[in-house]
Amino acid sequence: MEQAPEDQGPQREPYHEWTLELLEELKNEAVRHFPRPWLHGLGQYVYSTYGDTWEGVEAVIRILQQLLFIHFRIGCHHSRIGIIPQRRGRNGASRS
């Protein structure tokens, strides 16, 4: 029977340290794009649902990633990423 290879040395970075760094980066980015009361409400919701646990940290990361992805995809005015409506000439004609 095949077995998974054994761990070939130490991890590059501990999971919890990496997770907290990712959370900090996402929070800093979210503050630039969303109102603070919304983010505070998100934090309150996650805390009331998960308490002070790693599942809560992972939930905040997952939700912030989804919010930022959608925000950029729709067309953030702070970013070059996203869908930006094309300007059209009169009667919808495009300039080719």
UniProtKB/Swiss-Prot annotation:
Keywords: Activator, AIDS, Apoptosis, Cell cycle, Host G2/M cell cycle arrest by virus, Host nucleus, Host-virus interaction, Ion channel, Ion transport, Modulation of host cell cycle by virus, Phosphoprotein, Transcription, Transcription regulation, Transport, Viral penetration into host nucleus, Virion, Virus entry into host cell
Modified residues (Phosphoserine): 79, 94, 96
PTM comment, free text: Phosphorylated on several residues by host. These phosphorylations regulate VPR activity for the nuclear import of the HIV-1 pre-integration complex.
A GO term from the CC aspect: host extracellular space
Domain of life, per lineage: Viruses
Record's subcellular location: Virion; Host nucleus; Host extracellular space
Family: Belongs to the HIV-1 VPR protein family.
Subunit-level organization: Homooligomer, may form homodimer. Interacts with p6-gag region of the Pr55 Gag precursor protein through a (Leu-X-X)4 motif near the C-terminus of the P6gag protein. Interacts with host UNG. May interact with host RAD23A/HHR23A. Interacts with host VPRBP/DCAF1, leading to hijack the CUL4A-RBX1-DDB1-DCAF1/VPRBP complex, mediating ubiquitination of host proteins such as TERT and ZGPAT and arrest of the cell cycle in G2 phase.
Additional notes on this entry: HIV-1 lineages are divided in three main groups, M (for Major), O (for Outlier), and N (for New, or Non-M, Non-O). The vast majority of strains found worldwide belong to the group M. Group O seems to be endemic to and largely confined to Cameroon and neighboring countries in West Central Africa, where these viruses represent a small minority of HIV-1 strains. The group N is represented by a limited number of isolates from Cameroonian persons. The group M is further subdivided in 9 clades or subtypes (A to D, F to H, J and K).
Protein name in UniProt: Protein Vpr
